[in-house]
Amino acid sequence: MKVIRKLKAKRVVIKVGTSTLVYPDGSINLRAIDQLAFVISAMRHRGREVVLVSSGAIGVGLNYMGLKQRPKAIPEQQAIAAIGQTELISIYKERFAIYEQKIGQLLLTRDIFVYPKSHHNVLNTFEALLKQNVVPIVNENDTVAVDELDHETKFGDNDQLSAIVATNIGADLLIMLSDIDGFYDGNPNADARAQLLGHIEKVDQHTYKLAGGSGSRFGTGGMVTKLKAAERMIDANGQMILANGADPTIIFQILAGEPVGTLFG
């Protein structure tokens, strides 16, 4: 008997990692971006409210500048992010326009959610965009985000950013697309016996012990950051699905309740 998941998905946040948008050799995966635009546009046309949290600014910037490695110096990283974000949003605008879907860009820092006035204003911006049938595309403002002793502006990674956005705007579901099929009970790259876990109701210390590793060469997120995002969603009575973003049309399967990836909550 086929298992069908019960999901609430009126308002959905989709987080796409750099590994989905940029090939391992550093070139831009235009096919994946086009599929993402197609899926999200279809969701909007069917009445769902969708916010896209997109990584990739530095990865796209490296490609644009013909560089193979992320620079180590913060000013150089932030310069690459500024270049890449401009190119990335231009690609998104072009691809979404094919499907007659308008987009709007929001570049955020953590302190926006800390201070009441800016917090209130950014939530109003999200609501206004969604009301006008516009898809907000969100990224951390890497060009200015830094952590200082008395003033934190960085989210740390877009896994955390996506969960913070989702819980603040009252999203039912966070779909996190990455370069892995879901959450395993071991490292599938090192252990052939590792099993994909289809459903995790609660993220606890045992779950964290199963996780490990860091992000890709072009990204920053690892499994631990994804678990923290899932924990945040569960605490807010939401759900999160972690799935492989190699083919973004997997989102259709997720919304149909098919048991792909790992459901948290």
Swiss-Prot record:
Catalytic activity line of the entry: L-glutamate + ATP = L-glutamyl 5-phosphate + ADP
Binding site for substrate: 55, 142, 158
Pfam families in alphabetical order: AA_kinase
Cellular localization per UniProt: Cytoplasm
Binding sites annotated in the UniProt record for ATP: 15, 178-179, 220-226
The keyword Amino-acid biosynthesis belongs to this UniProt entry's keyword annotation: yes
Entry keyword annotation includes Transferase: yes
HAMAP family on file: ProB (MF_00456)
Assigned protein family: Belongs to the glutamate 5-kinase family.
Protein name, as recorded: Glutamate 5-kinase
Organism: Lactiplantibacillus plantarum (strain ATCC BAA-793 / NCIMB 8826 / WCFS1) (Lactobacillus plantarum)
